[in-house]
């Protein structure tokens, strides 16, 4: 459960990300494909080269979902309900991949905003990303 301080910290980080969210989403995917190559199996039709249009487009979707979750931080489940349905019922993505994606997003934020990622903010952002992952896998059961 995200505390009031967690919510403030997460919103603060996303305010710093601002207009870079789409780029960070693509960078997160690229990092995930390199660090966790098994995740590529869900994207057999993608050009997985650095900077590909497909990675940029999907990175934009990832970023939009995270921004949507931040904008509805008190109802992440409601905000991401359709996305949860899609991943559970149609795409059938292994739930562990959301943890991988969250970890890679944390790394991207740390690279671009090292001073913003204090231990407290890091913990809050990690809790938020875990909450998003939990929502996206909730309908697997």
UniProtKB/Swiss-Prot annotation:
Gene Ontology molecular function: any one: iron ion binding
- A GO CC term? blood microparticle
What are the binding positions for heme b in this chain?
87
Q: Which GO terms describe its biological process?
A: hydrogen peroxide catabolic process
Pfam families tied to this protein: Globin (PF00042)
Q: Does the keyword Nucleus apply?
A: no
Signal peptide location: none
The entry marks the following residues as binding O2, namely 58
Say which domain of life the source belongs to.
Answer: Eukaryota
- What is the tissue specificity? Red blood cells.
Q: Which UniProt keywords apply?
A: Heme, Iron, Metal-binding, Oxygen transport, Transport
What are the residue boundaries of the Globin domain, all occurrences included?
1-141
UniProt keyword Iron present: yes
UniProt xrefs under CDD domains: Hb-alpha-like
On subunit structure and binding partners, the annotation says: Heterotetramer of two alpha chains and two beta chains.
Q: Which family does it belong to?
A: Belongs to the globin family.
> What does the function comment of this entry state?
Involved in oxygen transport from the lung to the various peripheral tissues.
Protein name per its UniProtKB record:
Hemoglobin subunit alpha-A
Organism, as annotated: Cygnus olor (Mute swan)
UniProt lineage: Eukaryota, Metazoa, Chordata, Craniata, Vertebrata
């Amino acid at each position: 459960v995200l505390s009031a301080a967690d919510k403030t910290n997460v919103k603060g980080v996303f305010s710093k990300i601002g207009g870079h969210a789409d780029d960070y989403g693509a960078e997160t995917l690229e990092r995930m494909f390199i660090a966790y190559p098994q995740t590529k199996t869900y994207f057999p039709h993608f050009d997985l080269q650095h900077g590909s249009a497909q990675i940029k487009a999907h990175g934009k979707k990832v970023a939009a979902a995270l921004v949507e979750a931040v904008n509805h931080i008190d109802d992440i489940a409601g905000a991401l309900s359709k996305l949860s349905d899609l991943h559970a019922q149609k795409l059938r993505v292994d739930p562990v991949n959301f943890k991988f994606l969250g970890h890679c997003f944390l790394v991207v934020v740390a690279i671009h905003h090292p001073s913003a990622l204090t231990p407290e903010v890091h913990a809050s952002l990690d809790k938020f990303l875990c909450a998003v992952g939990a929502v996206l896998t909730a309908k697997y059961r």
